[in-house]
A protein has these predicted regions:
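Long, well-structured alpha-helical subdomains associated
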Residues: 21, 141-161
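Post-HEXXH active-site segment of zinc metalloproteases
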Residues: 94, 110-138
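Feature marks short, highly hydrophobic, charge-poor N-terminal signal-anchor/signal peptide-like helices
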Residues: 1-9
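Auxiliary, metal-adjacent structural segments of Zn-dependent hydrolase domains
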Residues: 22-83, 142
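N-terminal membrane-anchoring alpha-helices
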Residues: 8-26
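Active-site recognition of the HExxH zinc-binding catalytic motif
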Residues: 98-111
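Short pre-active-site segment immediately N-terminal to the catalytic Zn-binding motif
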Residues: 83-99
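Catalytic phosphate/metal-binding cores of nucleic-acid and nucleotide-processing enzymes, i.e., regions
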Residues: 99, 117, 145
């Protein structure tokens, strides 16, 4: 097999995949309630998931409107609380839902993973490839579409075309 042909084929596949990524259609949603209530509904939606992981209670949730942060959200294990920074999401409900789910996973980890507190040392263990962050991203990606679909069914949000 000619190595040049393989290189050109690989580049072509990459270009097509990149163009498809750029033009993918992402569903857009609009609130039928407040942002605070939306975040609470996402958190309530995770109730059965918390039960299957043996977590008995929800974290508290605070929604910050007033300051844009580098962070989308944060889980604070010492107070079992989640803070969501709305201005960091630019009103994208899919992203807000993903962030709540991501922080819920950290709540589960804080209760069930003995290494959770140690791995919070991002200076030592890094952030992006840190196991707890990878697991939280996998969790949000696994559940975000079903959560949004159920919230549509329940009238909390609706799709816009």
């Amino acid at each position: 097999m000619n190595p040049d042909w393989l290189l050109y084929f690989s580049i072509t596949c990459f270009v097509f995949a990149f163009v498809a990524y750029l033009f993918r259609s992402e569903d857009k949603y609009k609130l039928n309630t407040s942002n605070v209530q939306f975040c609470r509904e996402v958190m309530k939606w995770t109730g059965p998931i918390l039960v299957t992981h043996g977590v008995k209670y929800f974290p508290s949730i605070t929604v910050r409107y007033n300051k844009k942060s580098r962070k989308m959200g944060v889980y604070i294990p010492s107070s079992n609380s989640i803070v969501i920074y709305l201005k960091s999401h630019d009103g994208n409900l899919s992203d807000i839902c993903s962030t709540v789910l991501h922080e819920i996973k950290h709540h589960i980890q804080s209760k069930k993973d003995p290494e959770f507190r140690k791995l919070l040392n991002y200076n030592k263990y890094g952030y992006y490839n840190n196991r707890i962050e990878r697991e939280a991203r996998d969790f949000e990606n696994a559940y975000v579409q079903n959560c949004l679909k159920d919230l549509c069914k329940n009238g909390i949000i609706h799709k816009v075309m």
